[in-house]
């Protein structure tokens, strides 16, 4: 479980001038906020959408006074912070609540692998070292979570690095954290990124482990609650 910032401000989404900036309105005042999710989010960031902002903890040279934390759509809270899944994975690993990684502990983060960096290296007594790459998922259609919501050459490269590590005797896993509660299963987004879709199937066939988890989100906390089926 990860705690969200206290005293979130409910506002109405107006526009997204660039990938990392959101303009929202509250009681007639325009608020400019940083968005820590570079995805397209076109099915979420619709005019009039209910968003939740947190005052920036440090101003410094920032151009925005707020951070976008959540969006609420049809009663479902959705986290819009693509950095959060790594914290969720680390917390669940430490709590021993991730069945595929029982007996493992965190050894390192941002681990060099070929021309990339992978999120985690795990170790455990009597277990082979395990490299893990975590991906944030926000797009869900009719209970089916889809990744990615925009083409991601980086995502395909990470999968190829995991395949190379597995071929050298390491465990290698891609973990998709669905930052909402209404997903039943996860699949690659074939239409948006056919290259990633074919690469993840190739990776799974080569022995890379693929997992997906959905989250429970409220205005106070976010927690991983259950694995969901992965459809490749």
Swiss-Prot record:
<comment type="similarity">
    <text>Belongs to the SfsA family.</text>
</comment>
<dbReference type="InterPro" id="IPR005224">
    <property type="entry name" value="SfsA"/>
</dbReference>
<dbReference type="Pfam" id="PF17746">
    <property type="entry name" value="SfsA_N"/>
</dbReference>
<dbReference type="InterPro" id="IPR041465">
    <property type="entry name" value="SfsA_N"/>
</dbReference>
<dbReference type="Pfam" id="PF03749">
    <property type="entry name" value="SfsA"/>
</dbReference>
<dbReference type="InterPro" id="IPR040452">
    <property type="entry name" value="SfsA_C"/>
</dbReference>
<dbReference type="GO" id="GO:0003677">
    <property type="term" value="F:DNA binding"/>
</dbReference>
<protein>
    <recommendedName>
        <fullName>Sugar fermentation stimulation protein homolog</fullName>
    </recommendedName>
</protein>
